[in-house]
């Protein structure tokens, strides 16, 4: 938690002033019962209207000062809490950006969203409440007991007995509920994960008529969450009735003792009123303290979960500068895999096993195989989204681990299977490839990606708005824009991970022809299910269950690789493969 508190360093002044002003407010509140006792004992007893007015004026003054102190404390506590949550959220988001795909896969998207939103908001609310009440409530409880001794020491002994009993109830319930709130948050994660999965795959759910089963699955998870929330709620709900019972018993005893003291002349009736007021103040503050403890318990549970993400160490380390020299015999290499294997975290079996091949600069490399054969896993190793479990991946003659992050990602641009665009304009999305690109660079990339025609047809051209996720564009348009975005950076290696699946054959062929015509020695990796898209590649890698079962040209593989021949024949018979 010390690391979490570090984000308060810019708000030390506010964190000190907020509780101090609340204590100042509480100090004035403690004088109110004494003034009321004077009104009863002196003003009313003597029928002194002037004295009553003066004391009422004092009460009004105390109320105004208390209000000013309360507003000031609220300002400082809100400023500290909001500033803290902003800094924490920024640090959390920044840390998430440093995590590798392995950590992202382990943590899960829905979990990270919960940490960034719900958990941080809960910590903010808990901190705001804590700064305002963590000193005020105990101060009023202790102060009321001390002030009671100034009124009547015998009656004040009731406070000495009552306060420890109340503390046992409050802190006992806090100890019982704190671990349960962690379980509640974990079950909330499950519900949010199911919600996200369902909304993301809503079309698949509709297509397979699985609405009822999805509702049942959600209800099961939601019922578990509800049961745990009710369990925690039932325990927390004991707080108020138990404290009220104890306070009311104490007031009854106080009235009994007070009546005896009045009869023997040990105290006046106004003093009894003051003592009852002090007891009520204790009740109010203990209820606040109970609520504070519940909220702080939730906040601490959430803070622990946020801390767990911040403590997640990135699995990859990138050097600050380029390391090593390129051997002369490897100067023509673009990508070299040497006995590479990959096993994902938590997976029982490797996704890739003993893969070795070399791609020369300027070559086009096709990657083909059945579903789950490891095609995406292979190309994900090139820009170092994952580190190989065994073996070495070399980029341009150097170990991929010797490249700084920016330089490696600048050399190897990847177009993912899912075409992901961001809210903004076509221009702003393309500039992700190179923020300094000119309009000429953008149009050149669009021409190569076969996207220039439809962009020119847009009323605003490059400045045409793009909705979040590219909802206002077709699948083919989104794929071509993501390819153009990668080309804007002018990479030395371009990876198309099944990113032309929404293109027709003519557009796909035109794209491959345009890529081949680019100046320089661009190395292209094309991952595809279509044999027709790969048959003109310089090399084709054939994967089967994580193993490289064939490597060569189209004609060579048809003669030597049964897996490739089976894929080709199955598509050729359907008319999907073309010469």
For each predicted feature, which ranges?
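Membrane-integrated ABC transporters
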Residues: 1-31, 36, 44-60, 65, ...
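An intracellular "coupling" helix at the cytosolic face of ABC transporter transmembrane type-1 domains
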Residues: 10-13, 98-102, 118-127, 131, ...
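ABC-type nucleotide-binding domain
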Residues: 327-579
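Extended non-transmembrane interhelical loops and adjacent amphipathic helices
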Residues: 1-9, 35-41, 45, 75-121, ...
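Transmembrane helices of ABC transporter permease
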Residues: 10, 14-27, 38, 59-62, ...
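Helix-loop-helix
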Residues: 48-54, 147-161, 231-305, 309-313
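Pre-NBD coupling/linker segments of ABC/ABC-like ATPases
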Residues: 314-330
């Amino acid at each position: 938690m010390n690391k979490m508190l570090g984000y308060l360093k810019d708000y030390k002044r506010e964190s000190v002033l907020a509780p101090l002003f609340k204590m100042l407010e509480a100090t004035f509140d403690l004088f109110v019962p004494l003034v009321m006792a004077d009104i009863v004992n002196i003003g009313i007893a003597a029928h002194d209207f002037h004295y009553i007015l003066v004391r009422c004026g004092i009460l009004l003054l105390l109320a105004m000062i208390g209000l000013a102190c309360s507003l000031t404390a609220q300002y400082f506590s809100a400023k500290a809490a909001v500033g803290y949550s902003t800094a924490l959220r920024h640090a959390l988001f920044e840390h998430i950006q440093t995590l590798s795909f392995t950590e992202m896969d382990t943590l899960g998207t829905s979990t990270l969203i919960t940490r960034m939103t719900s958990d941080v908001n809960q910590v903010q609310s808990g901190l705001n409440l804590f700064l305002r009440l963590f000193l005020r409530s105990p101060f009023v409880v202790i102060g009321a007991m001390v002030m009671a001794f100034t009124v009547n020491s015998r009656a004040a002994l009731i406070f000495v007995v009552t306060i420890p009993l109340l503390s046992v109830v409050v802190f006992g319930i806090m100890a019982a509920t704190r671990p349960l709130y962690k379980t509640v948050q974990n079950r909330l994660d499950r519900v949010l994960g199911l919600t996200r999965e369902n909304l993301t795959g809503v079309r698949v759910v509709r297509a397979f008529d699985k609405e009822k089963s999805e509702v049942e699955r959600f209800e099961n998870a939601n019922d578990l969450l509800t049961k745990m929330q009710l369990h925690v709620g039932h325990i927390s709900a004991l707080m108020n009735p138990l404290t009220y019972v104890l306070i009311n018993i104490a007031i009854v005893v106080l009235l009994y003792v007070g009546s005896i003291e009045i009869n023997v002349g040990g105290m006046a009736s106004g003093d009894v009123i003051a003592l009852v007021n002090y007891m009520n103040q204790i009740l109010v503050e203990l209820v606040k303290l109970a609520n504070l403890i519940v909220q702080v318990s939730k906040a601490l549970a959430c803070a622990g979960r946020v801390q767990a993400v911040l403590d997640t160490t990135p699995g990859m380390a990138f050097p600050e500068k380029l390391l090593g020299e390129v051997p002369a015999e490897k100067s023509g290499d673009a990508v070299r895999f040497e006995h590479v294997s990959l096993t994902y975290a938590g997976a029982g079996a490797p996704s890739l096993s003993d893969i070795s091949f070399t791609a020369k600069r300027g070559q086009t490399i096709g990657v083909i195989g059945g579903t789950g054969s490891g095609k995406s896993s292979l190309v994900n190793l090139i820009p170092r989204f994952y580190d190989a479990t065994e073996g070495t991946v070399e980029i341009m003659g150097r170990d991929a681990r010797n490249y700084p992050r920016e330089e490696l990602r600048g050399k190897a641009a990847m177009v993912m299977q899912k075409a992901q665009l961001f809210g903004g304009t076509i221009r702003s999305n393309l500039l992700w490839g190179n923020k300094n690109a000119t309009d000429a660079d953008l149009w050149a990339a669009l021409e190569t990606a076969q996207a220039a025609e439809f962009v020119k047809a847009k009323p605003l051209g490059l400045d045409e708005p793009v909705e979040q996720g590219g909802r206002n564009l077709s699948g083919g348009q989104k794929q071509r824009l993501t390819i153009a975005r990668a080309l804007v950076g002018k990479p030395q290696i371009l990876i198309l991970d099944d990113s032309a699946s929404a293109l027709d054959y003519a557009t796909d062929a035109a794209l491959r022809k345009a890529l081949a015509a680019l100046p320089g020695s661009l190395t292209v990796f094309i991952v595809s299910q279509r044999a027709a898209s790969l048959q003109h590649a310089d090399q084709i890698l054939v994967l089967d269950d994580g193993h490289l079962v064939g490597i060569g040209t189209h004609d060579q593989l048809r003669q030597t690789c049964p897996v490739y021949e089976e894929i080709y024949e199955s598509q050729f018979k359907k008319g999907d493969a073309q010469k």
